[in-house]
Amino acid sequence: MVQSAPPITAQRNGVTPFITKLQAPLTKQPITTLQINLGRRCNLACTHCHVEAGPKRTEELSPEVCDQLIEIIRRFPQIKTVDLTGGAPEMNYGFRPLVEAARQAGKTVIVRSNLTIFFEPGFEDLPEYFAQHQLRVVASMPCYLEDNVDKQRGAGVYSSSIRALQKLNELGYGTDPALQLDLVYNPQVPRTEKFSLTPDQQQLQQDYKAYLEDHFGIVFNHLFTITNLPIGRVKQYLAAKSLYWPYVQFLEANHNGSTIGNLMCRDQLSIDYLGNIYDCDFNQMEHVPSKLPNGTALTVAHLLEAGSLDVLEEIQTRPYCYGCTAGSGSSCGGALV
């Protein structure tokens, strides 16, 4: 049973409740994407990780929940995309069964990879496996400069990531239309109150492409810019520096109402390794479950019993939702406007 955090209904520390800002409930649209968090196990422990994943984490998908998810993938043709994340999703139980079931059902499958997993014992075949099943690779690359990447993700991560990208290019990723390779930019966690919005996605993509091709011969399709939401390790760091509420206030001050129609929470379900369902991966990490109209927390078992994915009405919101609506907006697919 998920222990739900209490809803925030009144202004707190100068921050307007997100739902009050919208002046109307944030509602679900028909579900087209399942984002499945397979577990917390990861070979890295990045400072910006909202999942707080790492090598010592053991939580992962169970065979029972994996079977339920495969049934959902096969039963509902409205699902167009299955988005696999973690931790390092490749390290957690159920990764390959879910990939193969989803591809057999004709779904687009996204794997959110840290790239360095390719060089861990037992995972050396991953690049070829990705290509064989035509997985869309969304790879973490928080900067195109070595120093910044290694500061966020650990010494040597940049060089491993470069080798991994070159391997994917050799297999056709970034050039073959069936093998899409996208990179993800995360800004560094704020260290002072001199906050800034995520850089313009198109301009930064041009910078990434020019640098990586000129220096390493690497090509890729798209760059996604993602705002650091104040949850997980980012929240802990900001709170320790007394920057948590000032950062949330900054995000609210830059709220852009035109992002609302494109928010990823509207047409996706986020599912954890226990089979609990959330409106987004961020709510999952903050233990804010999706709720049926009667207040019951939604699970995968409920979906199978109901025979429908479209059982939710109102999306659960919290102050960190401003991270997805600030500036040009933010999502697992990058900027929104």
Annotate each language-model stretch with its function.
Residues 1-24, 240, 313-337:
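Radical SAM enzyme core and accessory elements
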Residues 3-86, 90-101, 105:
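Conserved alpha-helical substructure of the radical SAM core
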Residues 33, 53-63, 78-92, 103-167, ...:
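Core AdoMet radical
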Residues 34, 70, 99, 127, ...:
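Generic structural signal for well-ordered alpha-helices
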Residues 45, 78, 133-134, 177-180, ...:
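Short loop/turn motifs at secondary-structure junctions
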Residues 138, 145-265:
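Radical SAM enzyme [4Fe-4S]-AdoMet core and its adjacent flexible, acidic
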Residues 276-337:
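Flexible mid-to-C-terminal extensions adjoining Fe-S/redox cofactors in radical SAM and related proteins
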